[in-house]
Amino acid sequence: MSKTDVVEIEGTVIEKLPNAMFSVELENGHRVLAHISGKLRMNFIKIVPGDKVTLELSPYDLTKGRIIWRDK
């Protein structure tokens, strides 16, 4: 899957789950299960509930995503 196929959307972290997974509520009210991207993991970026994040969603499965950016 190329990067042009992904959907970028913003949301708010609702809760932290085991194995670096997060429950994220999108701006439209839907909830998504998301994991951290490799760059955030390598740079030890901490994500806590309440943080605004940017997600990449696959057009094939809109219930799972990857957190690619944490807003300040």
From Swiss-Prot:
The keyword DNA repair is annotated on this UniProt entry: no
Gene3D superfamilies named among the record's database cross-references: Nucleic acid-binding proteins
The keyword RNA-binding belongs to this UniProt entry's keyword annotation: yes
Subcellular location(s) per record: Cytoplasm
Single GO molecular function: rRNA binding
Major localisation: cytoplasm
Domain of life: Bacteria
Keyword set, alphabetical order: Cytoplasm, Initiation factor, Protein biosynthesis, RNA-binding, rRNA-binding
Cellular component, GO annotation: cytosol
Domain S1-like as annotated: residue spans: 1-72
Subunit composition and interactions: Component of the 30S ribosomal translation pre-initiation complex which assembles on the 30S ribosome in the order IF-2 and IF-3, IF-1 and N-formylmethionyl-tRNA(fMet); mRNA recruitment can occur at any time during PIC assembly.
Family affiliation: Belongs to the IF-1 family.
Record function comment: One of the essential components for the initiation of protein synthesis. Stabilizes the binding of IF-2 and IF-3 on the 30S subunit to which N-formylmethionyl-tRNA(fMet) subsequently binds. Helps modulate mRNA selection, yielding the 30S pre-initiation complex (PIC). Upon addition of the 50S ribosomal subunit IF-1, IF-2 and IF-3 are released leaving the mature 70S translation initiation complex.
Protein name in the entry: Translation initiation factor IF-1
Native source species: Lachnoclostridium phytofermentans (strain ATCC 700394 / DSM 18823 / ISDg) (Clostridium phytofermentans)
Species classification: Bacteria, Bacillati, Bacillota, Clostridia, Lachnospirales
